[in-house]
Amino acid sequence: MSNIQLIVGLGNPGLEYKYTRHNAGTWLVENLARMHNCTLSLQSKFFGYTGRVTIGGQDIRLLIPTTYMNKSGQAVAALAGFYRIPPESILVAYDELDLPPGIAKFKLGGSSSQNGIRDIVSSLGNNKDFYRLRVGIGHPGHKGKVSGYVLGKAPAKEQEQMDAAIDEGVRCIEILIKDDMKKAMNRLHSFKAE
C-alpha cells in the first residue's frame, strides 16, 4: 500500500491553455476528481484548485496549481507545507515530450527537463524524491518547435490516445494507492492506446 497523500496535476491556467498538450497533468487530476465526485475549489492560499478524495481508505488531497507551469512549485510547497506532506507522499502528473501519445509511465525521483517539475524540486528544497506520472504527448522532432508544440492542441487521434492513457493512469493511481507501485507500474507500463 502506498502512502500518497497529495496528487498534483500540472498545466497552465486560463481558457487559452485548457486544451493544450501542456495541460495533460491537469486533465488527469480533473478526471480523478470527477471519478470520485469531488468538486475542486479555488484556494488562494494554495495557489490552485484543491479537493479531497478517499481511495482505498486513504485521505488524498488533489491540487491543480493556478500558477503558470514554471511556477508550479509555489502551489505544491504551500499545500505540502501546510498539511506537512513529505515529498515521498506526493505524486505529480505532467506532460512528457519523450513519450508518444497513448503512453503514460510512473517514475520515482530523478531529474527532469520539464519546467514544472524543476520548479517543484527547487520549491521542495531540491528534494527530487516524489512520484511522477508522465503522460506522453510526443515530440515535434526539433528542439526549436517544442514551445509551440506543447502550447498547441493535439490532432483528434492524438488527443484520443492521450485521453486513453490518462484514463488508464487514473485506474493505475488507484492500484498504486490500494496495492503498490510495482503492480501499478506493471499495468501502466504495458498499456498503449491505439
UniProtKB/Swiss-Prot annotation:
Task: Tell me which residues are marked as the site Discriminates between blocked and unblocked aminoacyl-tRNA.
Answer: 12
Name the catalytic site residues.
22
Spell out the Pfam families in the cross-references. Answer: Pept_tRNA_hydro
Chain segments annotated as coiled-coil in the UniProt record: none
Cellular-component GO terms for this entry: cytoplasm
EC number from the UniProt entry: 3.1.1.29
The uppermost taxa in this organism's lineage are: Bacteria, Pseudomonadati, Pseudomonadota, Gammaproteobacteria, Alteromonadales
Q: Where is this site: Stabilizes the basic form of H active site to accept a proton?
A: 95
Which gene produces this protein? pth
Assigned keywords, A-Z: Cytoplasm, Hydrolase, RNA-binding, tRNA-binding
**Where's it mainly located?**
cytoplasm
Keyword Acyltransferase carried by entry: no
- Which amino acids does the record list as binding tRNA? 17, 68, 70, 115
Instruction: Quote the protein name from its UniProt record.
Output: Peptidyl-tRNA hydrolase
What is an example of a GO molecular function annotated in this UniProt entry? peptidyl-tRNA hydrolase activity
Q: What subunit structure does UniProt give?
A: Monomer.
How would you classify this enzyme at the top EC level? hydrolase
Query: Which species is the source of this protein?
Result: Pseudoalteromonas atlantica (strain T6c / ATCC BAA-1087)
On whether Ligase is a keyword of this UniProt record, the answer is no
Q: What does this protein do, in the record's words? A: Hydrolyzes ribosome-free peptidyl-tRNAs (with 1 or more amino acids incorporated), which drop off the ribosome during protein synthesis, or as a result of ribosome stalling. Catalyzes the release of premature peptidyl moieties from peptidyl-tRNA molecules trapped in stalled 50S ribosomal subunits, and thus maintains levels of free tRNAs and 50S ribosomes.
